[in-house]
């Protein structure tokens, strides 16, 4: 099977596009996911990934690139959630739940109005084997941009993630870096739709980062390890999907989950097996 997969990479251009895109998404989602779980924003990641759905549907209706609509609605959802949380007694999880369900419902209504149901199905559940050249290059461009922003603002994102009160006392614009991270999260969510769809994007963000957290002792190490795990799971999941003719996006997610499960038992920081033995 491995030989057939390698031969397929040599013969089929669509598989080459899928492999490159999968690696890029795995690396970038793994990096951004580290900040998401450190801030306790896993639910926010899920909300943003689903909030882009009405933007995608509206883009199909209007005949424009789905990146435009998805990014617009993703950022809009982030702004609404932050505004509700900051201007009412409602807690963040409640604000996220209200916004998430509302945007999802709007997306479903727009899907029923849109004509291109096949393309929308791919957006919902992913079809990385159908990635075109333009989509691949957009993914690469977004990936480079996201990693560049993380590199430039690493110290600020680090401090605002671990101790926002201290960061604010030092004069840092905490809200600015919050929205900056939301922009990065939205960009990654839109890009990852091609591989796993809006339904499973949060798994690409959270699972590799959570696995890396079990091993890493510093944020830099965590980001590097999470990106490597994300890329590795993407390649292995693509191989499984192509070889066994199953959904590649779901295979990527399950591969990442399996790596986490193994790490849960053997990671030094977890020490689950040692505690059970004792």
UniProtKB/Swiss-Prot annotation:
CDD domains: TM_ABC_iron-siderophores_like. This is Manganese import system permease protein ScaB. It is a multi-pass membrane protein. The chain crosses the membrane at residues 18-38, 61-81, 94-114, 134-154, 174-194, 196-216, 222-242, 246-266. The complex is composed of two ATP-binding proteins (ScaC), two transmembrane proteins (ScaB) and a solute-binding protein (ScaA). Pfam families: ABC-3. GO terms for biological process: response to zinc ion; transmembrane transport. Signal peptide: none annotated. Part of the high-affinity ABC transporter complex ScaABC involved in manganese import. Probably responsible for the translocation of the substrate across the membrane. Essential for growth under Mn(2+)-limiting conditions. It comes from Streptococcus gordonii. Belongs to the ABC-3 integral membrane protein family. It is found in: Cell membrane. The lineage of its organism: Bacteria, Bacillati, Bacillota, Bacilli, Lactobacillales. The gene is scaB. Its main location: membrane.
């Amino acid at each position: 099977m491995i030989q057939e997969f390698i031969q397929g990479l040599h013969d089929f251009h669509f598989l080459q596009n899928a492999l490159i895109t999968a690696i890029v998404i795995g690396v970038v989602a793994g990096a951004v996911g580290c900040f998401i779980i450190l801030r306790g924003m896993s639910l926010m990641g899920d909300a943003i990934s689903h909030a882009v759905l009405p933007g995608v549907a509206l883009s199909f209706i209007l005949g424009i690139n789905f990146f435009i609509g998805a990014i617009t609605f993703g950022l809009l959802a982030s702004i609404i959630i932050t505004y509700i949380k900051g201007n009412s007694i409602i807690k963040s999880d409640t604000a996220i739940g209200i916004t998430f369900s509302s945007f999802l419902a709007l997306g479903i209504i727009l899907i029923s109005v849109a004509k291109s149901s096949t393309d929308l199905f791919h957006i919902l559940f992913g079809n990385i084997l159908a990635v075109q050249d333009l989509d691949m290059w957009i993914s690469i461009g977004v990936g480079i941009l996201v990693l560049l922003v993380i590199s430039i603002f690493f110290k600020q994102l680090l401090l605002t993630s671990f101790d926002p009160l201290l960061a604010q006392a030092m004069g840092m614009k905490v809200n600015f870096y919050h929205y900056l991270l939301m922009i990065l999260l939205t960009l990654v969510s839109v890009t990852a739709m091609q591989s796993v769809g809006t339904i499973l994007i949060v798994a690409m963000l959270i699972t590799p980062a959570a696995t890396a957290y079990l091993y890493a002792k510093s944020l830099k190490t965590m980001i590097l390890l999470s990106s490597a795990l994300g890329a590795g799971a993407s390649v292995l999941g693509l191989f499984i999907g192509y070889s066994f003719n199953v959904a590649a996006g779901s295979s990527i997610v399950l591969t990442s989950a399996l790596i986490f499960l193994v790490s849960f038992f053997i990671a030094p920081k977890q020490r689950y097996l040692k505690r059970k033995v004792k």
